[in-house]
Amino acid sequence: MARITVEDCLEHIPNRFQLVLAATYRARMLSQGHAPKIESRNKPAVTALREIAEGKIGLEMLKKVPG
């Protein structure tokens, strides 16, 4: 399996801070039992980054978080 890099994710979410927030929220959702949007046997944080790198998840993750 290929390594995931920040540069892969930055193509979809160009702001590093927003990238971290989106990945964190998605990883939390995955750890709470939500279904992953890709096939992965990785931990939730890596799965979240892979979803972002593949374009399955984007900035919409930040809009789903209660403010």
Curated annotation (Swiss-Prot):
Disulfide bonds: none
BP GO terms, sorted: DNA-templated transcription
Signal sequence interval, chain numbering: none
UniProt KW keywords: DNA-directed RNA polymerase, Nucleotidyltransferase, Transcription, Transferase
Catalysed reaction equations from the record: RNA(n) + a ribonucleoside 5'-triphosphate = RNA(n+1) + diphosphate
E.C. code: 2.7.7.6
Gene3D superfamilies listed in its UniProt record: 3.90.940.10
One GO CC annotation: DNA-directed RNA polymerase complex
Pfam families with a match to the protein in the record: RNA_pol_Rpb6 (PF01192)
Superkingdom: Bacteria
One of the record's GO molecular function terms: DNA binding
Assembly with partners or alone: The RNAP catalytic core consists of 2 alpha, 1 beta, 1 beta' and 1 omega subunit. When a sigma factor is associated with the core the holoenzyme is formed, which can initiate transcription.
Family: Belongs to the RNA polymerase subunit omega family.
Classification via NCBIfam families: rpoZ
HAMAP family: RNApol_bact_RpoZ (MF_00366)
Biological function: Promotes RNA polymerase assembly. Latches the N- and C-terminal regions of the beta' subunit thereby facilitating its interaction with the beta and alpha subunits.
Name of protein: DNA-directed RNA polymerase subunit omega
Organism: Paracidovorax citrulli (strain AAC00-1)
Gene transcribed to yield this protein: rpoZ
